[in-house]
Every structure is written in structure tokens, then in C-alpha cells.
């Protein structure tokens, strides 16, 4: 076996490029030459690597990605994906106030049924979210995202109703937004990132997100990538509407890419979920260009990590059951 090529920094290029695997593969799939990829890695991440190192990395990392569906028969795989899609859709939309039950949601998605006594908007929201799940799965192999992907997902997830120019679908917010929470027995308003600063902050977010996209080696790093993407996206709240649903979808991209089932925030945990996000954001302050660290550490963040780990168990159990049934 030949010696592993080492960069000027003394670290093997395989180790240096590993966190950016998805990014490198995405550039290659877009037709970018290995020489141009090496230069792009230098500009984006300060990596001093040769084009030969990039070519070698691509050769040794060309194997098919693992998937949580591996080892499951085609029939059970289809049923498992339907179950996860319906659960994810139900819980995410229920957190936002949708009144359809999980059974209702499955009937709407599977058979296109209309549930008596439920609003048209409730039906539209679950169909839109399920389409969002499909979109997320469709862009997995890109290994990175661009603003256009986030805009496309927003157009899919937020029903295309008549809006004014200050509430655009598929574009960053044009008006400041915020939320109210209880603190010390009184109602307190907390702003999100300003509309003027959102485009630049989202550039930061997308760059940081892509750096984590393909560098996941285990469940712990998958959980960390999810928490980072989810909470930092919510801090910015880049759209006038749909931010929670998009955060819960986008944050699962690195999780799915690494071969794990998605993390689904259960609807019954809605109050805990909202409270922990609120408490964390109050603890670290409003994000801005002057205070642009995307995810400052806080004890409140540890609380969220523990909750997310618990919530993940639902889909992990679904997969384990499907694999157990296949034996």
C-alpha cells in the first residue's frame, strides 16, 4: 500500500478533506475539475491540497452511501418510508397548529382523502410538508445546499396563497419578525435576526451547514449537526412563515446523508420544544452581524441535545423493528 499523501500542515489529506466530502462530491457532480476543486477548498476552508490529492480522495470515497434502509426488503422499505414520511409530516405540522391526526394524515397522503370537519389549509399543509420530505430526499446526493435549494423548499412547504410583497414565498423575509414568550410572569417580545441582515447571516449559515453536511462519522456527530442546523436556523428565522417546518426538514439532511433515519420532533413535546428554543435564544441573545456566532454554547443547548436524542428514538425504533421483521 502506498504512503498517504500529507498536506503542508502535516495532516493527511484524507483527514483534511473528510469533513467536506459532500461538498467535494457536489462540486465534482457539477462538472468542476479536480484542480478547480482544490482551489475552491483553499478559498473556502484554507486547505492547502493539490489537485492530485482531490482526485485520490474522490477515488477512495466513491462508494455508495450507507442508508438506514440497507438490509430491509423492498416491500418493507416502501412501507417504512411511508410511515416515516407520515409521522414526520404529522408531527411537524401539528406543532404549527394542524389539527389532522396521524391517521388522518396517512389517509390524506396515501389515498388523497378529505377528512370531514377539517379545514382545507390543514389538508394543504400536510401535502406540502410531505412534498418537502420528498424534496429533501431528492437533493441528498448533492451533498451540499445553496440558497436556491432553501428557497425551493420554502415554495414547496408554504402553500402558495396570495401574499403581499412583504411576505414573499421563496425569498428571504422583507420585514423584521419575532416571537413572544413568558418570562417572570410577563409577556416578553424577542426579535429574530433583522430582515436587512438576514441575507448575509444566511450565507454564513449555508457555509457552516455545508461544512457539516458530509463529515458525519457516527450518531453523536449526526445529532450535533442536526442541533446546529435546526437551532441556528430558528435563531435567524429567515422567512416570514414556515421557519419551523423548514428547520426540521433541513436539519435532517446531514442526518439522512450519513445513513440515519430522520429526527422527528414529536407533536406532544410541542411545549417543551418551544420553551427550550425560547430559553436558549434568550440566554445567548439576538443574532446579528455584530453578534454573528451561529450557535453560541449555553447550558440551554445541552437541554436541547438531550431532548433531540430522546426524540430520535422513535424513528430508530421503527427502523430496528423493520430490520427485525426481515430476519
Can you name each region flagged by the protein language model?
Residues 3, 8-11, 29, 38-52, ...:
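FIC/Doc superfamily catalytic core
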Amino acid at each position: 500500500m502506498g504512503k498517504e499523501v500529507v498536506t503542508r500542515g502535516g495532516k493527511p489529506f484524507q483527514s483534511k478533506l473528510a469533513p467536506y466530502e459532500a461538498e467535494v462530491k457536489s462540486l465534482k457532480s457539477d462538472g468542476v475539475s479536480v484542480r478547480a476543486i482544490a482551489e475552491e477548498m483553499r478559498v473556502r476552508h484554507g486547505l492547502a491540497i493539490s489537485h492530485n490529492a482531490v482526485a485520490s480522495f474522490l477515488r477512495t470515497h466513491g462508494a455508495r452511501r450507507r442508508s438506514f434502509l440497507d438490509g430491509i426488503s423492498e416491500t418493507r422499505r416502501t412501507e417504512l418510508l411511508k410511515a416515516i414520511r407520515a409521522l414526520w409530516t404529522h408531527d411537524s405540522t401539528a406543532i404549527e397548529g394542524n389539527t389532522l391526526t396521524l391517521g388522518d394524515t396517512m389517509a390524506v397522503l396515501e389515498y388523497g382523502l378529505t377528512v370531514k370537519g377539517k379545514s382545507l389549509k390543514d389538508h394543504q399543509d400536510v401535502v406540502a410538508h410531505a412534498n418537502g420530505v420528498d424534496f429533501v430526499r431528492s437533493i441528498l446526493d448533492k451533498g451540499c445546499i445553496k440558497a436556491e435549494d432553501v428557497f425551493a423548499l420554502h415554495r414547496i412547504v408554504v402553500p402558495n396563497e396570495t401574499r403581499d410583497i412583504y411576505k414573499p414565498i421563496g425569498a428571504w423575509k422583507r420585514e423584521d419578525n419575532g416571537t413572544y414568550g413568558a418570562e417572570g410572569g410577563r409577556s416578553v417580545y424577542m426579535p429574530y435576526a433583522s430582515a436587512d441582515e438576514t441575507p448575509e447571516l444566511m450565507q454564513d449559515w449555508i457555509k457552516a451547514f455545508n461544512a457539516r453536511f458530509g463529515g458525519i462519522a457516527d450518531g453523536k456527530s449526526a445529532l450535533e449537526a442536526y442541533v446546529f442546523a435546526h437551532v441556528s436556523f430558528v435563531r435567524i428565522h429567515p422567512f416570514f412563515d414556515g421557519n419551523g417546518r423548514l428547520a426540521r426538514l433541513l436539519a435532517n439532511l446531514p442526518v439522512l446523508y450519513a445513513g440515519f433515519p430522520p429526527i422527528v420532533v414529536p407533536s406532544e413535546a410541542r411545549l417543551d420544544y418551544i420553551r427550550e428554543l425560547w430559553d436558549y435564544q434568550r440566554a445567548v441573545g439576538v443574532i446579528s452581524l455584530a453578534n454573528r456566532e451561529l450557535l453560541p454554547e449555553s447550558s440551554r443547548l445541552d437541554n436541547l441535545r438531550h431532548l433531540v436524542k430522546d426524540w430520535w428514538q422513535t424513528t430508530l425504533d421503527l427502523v430496528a423493528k423493520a430490520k427485525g421483521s426481515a430476519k
